[in-house]
Amino acid sequence: MNSRKSLSQPSFSNKVIDKNQLKNLIVWAFRNYGIARAANMADKLKDLGFHYATQAGISLSLEDLRIPPSKKSLLLSTIEEIKNTENKYRRGEITTVERFQKVIDTWNNASESLKQEVIEYFKETDPLNSVYMMAFSGARGNISQVRQLVGMRGLMADPQGQIIDLPISSNSREGLTVTDYFISSYGARKGLVDTALRTADSGYLTRRLVDVSQDVIIREVDCKTKKGIILEDLVDTQKVLINLEQALAGRVLAENVFHPEKGSLIAHTRQDISPNLAQEIVRAGIKKVLVRSPVTCNSRSSVCQYCYGWNLAHGRLVDLGEAVGIIAAQSIGEPGTQLAMRTFHTGGVFTGELAEQIYSPIDGKLTNLDFLSYMEVRTRHGEQALMTEKPTQVIIESSGKQKSIINLSKGTTLLVDNNEVVSKDQVIAESPRRNRLMIERAQKHVLSDLSGKICFSNLTVEETDNNQYTTRITKTGGLIWVLSGEVYNIPDSANIPVNKADQVNPGTILAQTELINQYSGKVRIYQNTSSSITNIQIITESVTVPACYIRTDVINKKESYILETDKKQRFLFKSFPDQKISDGHIVAELISDTYKTTSGGIIKYLDLNVSKKKTGPEKDAYDILSPGYILWISEETHEINKDSSLLLVNNGDVIESGTELVKNIFSKSSGIIEIIQKDGIVREIIIKPGFIYKLTDFYSIHDKSRGFLRPGETLHGNISTDKLVYWEYIENEQTPYILIRPVIVYSIPEIKSSLIENLTSQKVNQTKLKLVKRTVFRDGERVKSIDGVHLVTTNLVAEINHHDPNLVSAIEFLAKEDSSNCFALGLSTFETLSIKSIDNKVEKEQSQTRIIVSDGEYIQPLTVVASTEIISMSKGFVEEIHVEKNTSRRILLTTSIDNKVFDLHQQNTLVQVGDWIRCGDLISESIISLDSGQITHISQESATLRIARPYLVSNAAILHVDNNALIRKGETLAVLVFDRAKTGDIIQGLPRIEEILEARKKTDVLLNPHDILDASFNLYIECGLALYEAARLSFQEIQLLLVKEVQLVYQSQGVNISDKHIEVIVRQMTSKVKIENGEETGYLPGELVELQKIEQTNKSMTSRNKLNASYRPILLGITQASLNTESFISAASFQETTKVLTEAAISGKLDWLRGLKENVIIGRLIPAGTGFNMYDSHNDVANKKDINKNISTDNSPPSVRDDLDDIILDDRTARNYFNNKTVD
């Protein structure tokens, strides 16, 4: 009865039940009442929720998006602050980088303030607002999205990750402008793409984690270790991320816990910590607790029940046979997918957390500033501040003597001074978050807003010589002033008629460039229609070739130009009209079949003199230098390259024309066949025309097997000829034959052409045309062809006698008056002058170009053809003329616009001549200058200010200008070099986790785990610790560091993962050592062995008086740890299969099938869960049962437990029941 009564007493929770409270409620029900009742309650809650949601009729309309009225004033104050920043920049008090950072931080703070206003406004005016309830109950949406709906969208990042300093001040309720919309679209697209890519990354991370930890199974109850790890609050920059109470739940104590004041025992060793006990420990004021942990567990290749603690799903001690490795891998991998998705929802909105801001908790005065602990620094906003060089503290004392102590870590920037009054919630300091922010070195170009003269102020410059150029770098920060004026570029060849201090008017010529010809001739002006470029040609020579004309005709189905002479010789043009030609250029080729053969053959020269090397622009043929003859022995050559089995004829066969040689290949001529084959492949079939004579005695031919037989000569005593023939000896089926082959003789006469005579009769000095006969074949060359070739070509070739690069020769087609289709052939030589070449350095508005000569005019050498004049645009004075070498030639004019005159009205001035004035400074007691500049003149009546613009450059900036140099608007003054944080939502999260777990050796990150491990190991060895202890302790240090680093990434995204999951993974990464010297253990240097295994080996070596192996701890990334696992089956199924299996085979490895993966691959029952107890004896089970009785659970009523045991029968209950039966 009592148990029923205790159950009927309700538990009262007086809170708003949002998503988190709902979680806690269900966990409480699950822990106290079991899975069935908790599920039932969750069902009822769901029905309750739907019922009231239906009755209330929650809907979402545009009216629910309420914009807080304070938004307008907040925006106005922010814009005012931005104006002040811009003014500071214009005064040269901050650099462009500091301005950008200040603008971004100002907008970011405005956006955050507005977010708070939105929350307050909803809370106070409309707590039942649909949007507010939805976001804050945790049902849908988050505060960041609500901020964009009713606050402001804020700052966005561009595709490169750079923040755009133009914020979107409107929200979705007010609507976006076109600019806002375009800026927004960057982030939205980025979110979609990133999500797709990162989901795959996250999946691969999970796979690697599973692989590295799949063999971690709970195999024993207690490993009897005395070691553990100390748990405390996880703090990051003064913010508690995971409190001790949260961290303790589900752990087992490694030592007794006593009350620090009373001394009473709170909990004993090996007791598991329930949430209630954790609360009690924290209430007692205990800050650090030693607990058992998977990283200190002594079990070989597994974890014991006590070191693991609770199975967090059930809220009680983990079962034997539980595959905790896989649970750990999934627990770490799964949130990765959520992290990948998170970018998508905020859509690239920038959230700036470059520094953690420390606020004043009370109104008061800041005291206790120890100046020895600080150094003066410039903040990223360009303000002076103090930075702590060591951890220190400041005190804020209110008027009521209330004191608040604030601890500052090293590197914190203090923004207020000693004894300065601060108000509550004022930002007093910033601590950097640099340790986990990726810093990159960036550059920012400072561009001039004015044209004018450069003046350096307080700038120390250091010059460094690099191979080709000198780099100027600022050693100290300072100002670059640009004194306003008009700057004109002057071409190098220009003549400058003005002098320094001359007065000029609009239209005055400042510089003049003249275009002069080298040769006399006739002027021809070409105006390019597509641009304003004008070319002027001076024609030094022009000649028309007589007795020939050009017309178009169709040759080989292609329209071509044909040159015909009055002797009916026809030439095919190889050039086109107005084409520029060089010496040896082939203009045309004679159309003739005189030297065309019908097939291939052998070529022999007779009394023919040809050039030794190939000539012409293409170097493709030999010039024939004298008359002579070409002897041609024809033969038809088919290139086959087919198998010899496909042949339809045999070597030595005599065939008729049209015979099929191989399939679809026919002979064109009759003759005897010669087959050339290699390795069973027929390369060529040669058909040799001629007559065959059978020989009775071969040896009478002496030593020759081929040659020419002239008329009147005899061969073999009885073979004679009446014309020149070619003979060769052939042997067919051991019978000798003589093949007599016909020879065609081609005569090549001396070149005489009316065309040449006509040309030479003209007195041409520079360009001629000559006829040249050319051949592409060498003496004795065998020409492989079926259709025939041109043995000799007759070409019309240009002969140019001048070698001046300024003179160009060209072919011209001159229209004939009597015919529209015919042209005369002209040759001209001319000099080209381009007007573009003289005005490309000068802007069009400042210059005018005049062509002084007219088309068709005949001019003498060194005549001015055109001139470009650079003219003044304004009235003023010539202040500077720079014509030094190695710099641009420039002229500086000062006009009335560049000076500003102040009427003093007899007032005393507060400035002197030469003073630099910044905008907002006083000239006299009542006159404020709105411009920056330099005072150039002061009289009783007036003061003159030369307008200028100051640019602040930081130290280590790269200067692009010299002092007193002239610069134009938009040119680079300097490049500022600075460090900036890489922006990123979770995009930095996943790669960061991967980097930690893969133990990457990054150089630019402060945390290099490999270096830390080495350093701590060396330190412990120096302190005299044994090798094993030094390795174990250095491992433990790095383990805790890695766990903390992973937690920081996940916590920054609001994802809670229990430490023990990360510890299981880290344990696998830090289980191996690298052998340095194997001594007598049989291990090789560089081999990776488990720490416990090598220590056991060393102990056995010591007992046998043998030398121990030396080693050092090594940190493996998860991929490497997977590949170096004991099981080669598991490693091979992960990556590098061939390599793993080869190494395993060579070293004769055994796989004991301890893990899950190798058993799955083999096809056995996995050694976890129900498959775990297969080999255990009953006695062991009995012992475990007794031990389990001693383990305390949480403080829920025993009656509740007993009453609910039969509601759900899970594996464990069934197994325990079965085991108890067998023991009894």
Curated annotation (Swiss-Prot):
Catalytic activity, as annotated: RNA(n) + a ribonucleoside 5'-triphosphate = RNA(n+1) + diphosphate
Localisation per UniProt entry: Plastid, Chloroplast
Cofactor: Zn(2+)
GO BP field: DNA-templated transcription
Entry's EC annotation: 2.7.7.6
UniProt cofactor note: Binds 1 Zn(2+) ion per subunit.
InterPro entries found in the cross-reference section: DNA-dir_RpoC2_beta_pp, DNA-dir_RpoC_beta_prime, RNA_pol_Rpb1_3, RNA_pol_Rpb1_3_sf, RNA_pol_Rpb1_4, RNA_pol_Rpb1_5, Rpb1_funnel_sf
Gene Ontology cellular component list: chloroplast; DNA-directed RNA polymerase complex; mitochondrion
GO molecular function: DNA binding; DNA-directed RNA polymerase activity; zinc ion binding
HAMAP family: RNApol_bact_RpoC2
Record's function text: DNA-dependent RNA polymerase catalyzes the transcription of DNA into RNA using the four ribonucleoside triphosphates as substrates.
UniProt record similarity statement: Belongs to the RNA polymerase beta' chain family. RpoC2 subfamily.
Name of the protein described by the UniProt record: DNA-directed RNA polymerase subunit beta''
